[in-house]
From Swiss-Prot:
Name by which UniProt lists this protein: Septin homolog spn5
Region (G4 motif): 256-259
UniProt key word Nuclease: no
Gene coding for it: spn5
Entry membrane topology: Peripheral membrane protein
Region feature Disordered, mapped onto this chain: 28-91
Quaternary structure annotation from Swiss-Prot or TrEMBL: Component of the sporulation-specific septin complex composed of at least spn2, spn5, spn6 and spn7.
Binding, GTP: 125-132, 151, 177, 257-265, 304, 319
Ranges annotated as biased composition (Basic and acidic residues): 41-54, 69-81
Length: 464
């Protein structure tokens, strides 16, 4: 009995020992997992703290305080099931309370107010269209006697305009006229070179390993192309230059010296300009949905302002004529205010977006494709890219000119051959008529000799 009890108690002691070992092992595993979880939590807390510090450094004053409901309450989501095209339901979650997304506009506005909006413009057009006067008026400068040193000098005007809390870092590049030479086939090159140099500078900084993120964007966002009002439509030289530069910049057509036309003539001229640009497939900047809403009068009709004029106790920016005054700030007399609102308020984001997403991306793709096409290629400087691009464009222009010259030579040669044939025919006819005349005179001579008599003729010495 005792032996049986002893024998029966032996497995229980063995089982008890195994259970204690298992408990010890489980405790060790729990302790190691607890230590691991504590280390993970500390690591996560450090990462979160680091991310919060970076975010706070980047945002600065842009971080807006969340509402009390967002602080005190946890974000709760409501689940809905929306059927898809296959008939299966897809769970969709909607926040039940404020999660801070509605503060994004205020954060963006605060950042823009602190840093300001950078916008770069270039003024292009023929001479004596009031480009420099427009720049001074736009920048609210009284320096109306400023003139560029040379005909093709590029002059940068920089200014900071403010409207309440909003600041505009404005840069306008003045190009003092084209089309003054007898040969204007290459007058577009300085403009295109300047635009390409700015695109290349941005591209070169982008492809560098240690690129400067704080570098100011020098790309041109809009080209104010001044159109000559003397005529019924766009001039061939204006169309030629627009086609050459529309792939590098947003073209904004502007009619200079619009006070030389009546309102009816101006409206008719605007329609003709747009029709010519559409017919010639010139890519000018437009946003149809914004233009209908804001009633944008493209192309803009601009009147230059001279010295300030005092009228009825007010200082007016405009021009004085014998028949009255022209106020450039009056929307009924000039589109100056509409153009300023167009550039600074209604379409500034559209200009910058198209410059970066369309013009620069196309330029960047072409450069990268050309770079990867060369075996063993590496990133080259912007100056070399610019020279290569200009050489390619020059070769294309030379080929086009060679083709045109060959056609003109062939046409001239055909005209000369036709003229030679006409001259030969005329000479043959003249020679035949001359022979007939000689024959007729010989016959008349013989007849006279017979009538007078040979002896009398010989005696008188009439005919030798």
């Amino acid at each position: 009995m005792d032996s049986s009890n002893l024998s029966s108690s032996m497995p229980q002691e063995g089982q008890l020992k195994l259970t204690e070992e298992a408990i010890i092992t489980i405790k060790q595993v729990d302790e190691s997992s607890a230590k691991r979880s504590v280390s993970n939590e500390s690591r996560k807390s450090k990462d979160v703290t680091r991310k919060e510090q970076i975010a706070s450094d980047q945002q600065g004053d842009d971080q807006c305080p969340q509402s009390d409901t967002a602080k005190d309450k946890k974000t709760e989501f409501k689940q809905d099931e929306v059927p898809n095209s296959n008939g299966k339901s897809i769970p969709t979650f909607h926040p039940c309370n404020n999660i801070g997304i509605n503060d994004f506009n205020h954060q963006h506005y605060s950042r823009v107010c602190r840093n300001g909006i950078d916008i770069n413009l270039i003024v292009v057009g023929e001479s004596s269209l009031g480009k420099t006067t427009f720049v001074n008026s736009f920048l609210q400068s009284n320096d109306t006697n400023f003139r560029p040193k040379k005909t093709m000098d590029f002059v940068e005007h920089k200014a900071t305009l403010s409207d309440g809390d909003q600041k505009f870092n404005l840069t306008i590049v003045d190009t003092p006229g084209f089309g003054d030479k007898s040969d204007n086939s290459n007058c577009w090159r300085p403009i295109a070179t300047n635009l390409l140099h700015r695109l290349n500078a941005y591209f070169q900084n982008e492809v560098k390993m240690d690129r400067e993120t704080s570098e100011i964007d020098s790309r041109i966002h809009g080209c104010l192309f001044f159109i000559n009002p003397n005529g019924h439509r766009l001039q061939p030289l204006e169309i030629y230059i627009m086609k050459k530069i529309d792939q590098f910049v947003n073209i904004i057509p502007v009619i200079g010296k619009a006070d030389t036309m009546t309102s009816d003539e101006l409206n008719h001229f605007k329609k003709r300009v747009i029709a010519d640009m559409v017919r010639e497939k010139i890519r000018y900047f437009r946003e149809p949905h914004n233009e209908k809403k804001a009633k944008i009068p493209i192309p803009f009709a601009i009147v230059g302002a001279g010295a300030p004029i005092e009228h009825d106790g007010k200082c007016i920016r405009g021009r004085a004529y014998p028949w009255g005054l022209v106020d450039i700030d009056d929307p009924k007399q000039s589109d100056f205010c509409q153009l300023r609102n167009f550039l600074l308020y209604t379409h500034i984001e559209g200009l910058k977006h198209k410059t970066h997403k369309l013009i620069y991306d196309t330029f960047r793709t072409e450069k990268l494709v050309a770079l990867n096409a060369t075996p063993g290629s590496q990133f080259i400087s912007a100056e070399e890219m610019n020279q290569k691009y200009i050489s390619e464009q020059t070769q294309l222009v030379e080929e086009a000119l060679t083709k045109v010259m060959k056609e003109k030579y062939r046409e001239k040669e055909n005209n000369l051959e036709l003229l030679e044939t006409n001259l030969k025919t005329h000479h043959k006819d003249y020679k035949h008529a001359l022979k007939k005349r000689i024959t007729a005179l010989e016959e008349e001579k013989n007849r006279l000799i017979k009538e007078i008599g040979p002896e009398k003729v010989k005696k008188a010495g009439i005919l030798a």
